[in-house]
Amino acid sequence: IVINLKTIIYSSVYIQHDLQNCFQEQIRLQGQVRLLEHRVKQQQLKVVQLLEKKEIQYSDRGDENSVIDLGGKRQYSDCAEIYNDGHKQSGFYKMKPIQSPAEFLAFCDMSEGGGWTVFQRRSDGSQSFDRVWTDYEEGFGNFVLPNGEYWLGNKNLHYLTNQGNYTLRIDLTDFEGERRFAQYARFGVAGEEQSYEMSCGEYSGTAGDSLTGGFHPDVKWWADHRGMKFSTRDRDNDNYEGNCAEEEKAGWWFNRCHSANLNGLYYKGPYTAKTDNGIVWYTWHGWWYSLKSVVMKVRPADFQPNIV
């Protein structure tokens, strides 16, 4: 009996030792699983970023059928020059502003007097505007369809507006079919060294003055977008303790954070979210209504349409 008891005791000790080893091995394997999950998430993020870059480089940059042929006789600095040279059809044209090192493609809106260079369009939510700094710098989106969503690129927007005095016009449409607009004098975007800081002058229009924070002083001090640098989720230049671009899912000239965010998520009208991250124009529909379509476009302030 004594021998059997000793055998049982020794066996229980070995079993406890084996159990302890199993627990330690389990802890080690759990740590490896967490490490692998972290690495997988990192790789997934890299894949998403590479796909976004690939979209910028290869997709939707226009083909020969979507670009209006001007015959190669001269280079144009913007859509105003194209219009006054007799090309009255809205569509995609190649242009080269004075300081731009290369030609680029942009949509020319020949309505409202003609000569408008479109640098942003929202129409159906088909493009993600929750992008990193280089995406917004170089431009992205659909450069084929006449109503395709795109961002022309902060570099190109700087080259355009640095040529002289430009007027900004913003056309807005809600899901009830109502259309309004906002227009700003002396619109400009600084260069890369100033993080593409935005400036604008006097407002006119029917949508309300959201770019300067609206009319209410309790909103204006933290929501005025004038003089703000551009921010993206990976380049935070706002005045907020957190990261506006990350919270609002967009690149924009955020303050603390916004009274206008036309690069927000595409909802269909009224929406509910943790933050007011829709396509927002506060002075028209407030922060919790996302607009159906937006067009942002510029034209020289001294533009005189050639009717010939």
Regions found by a protein language model. Name each.
Residues I1-D109, G113-G114, P305-V308:
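Assembly "stalks" and propeptides
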Residues V67-R226, N306:
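Extracellular beta-rich globular recognition domains, centered on the fibrinogen C-terminal
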Residues D130, E137, N237, E241-G286:
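Glycine-anchored, exposed beta-strand/edge motif detector
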Residues H216-E247:
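Extended, non-catalytic structural segments that build the interaction scaffolds
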Residues D276-V308:
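C-terminal helix/juxtamembrane-tail motif
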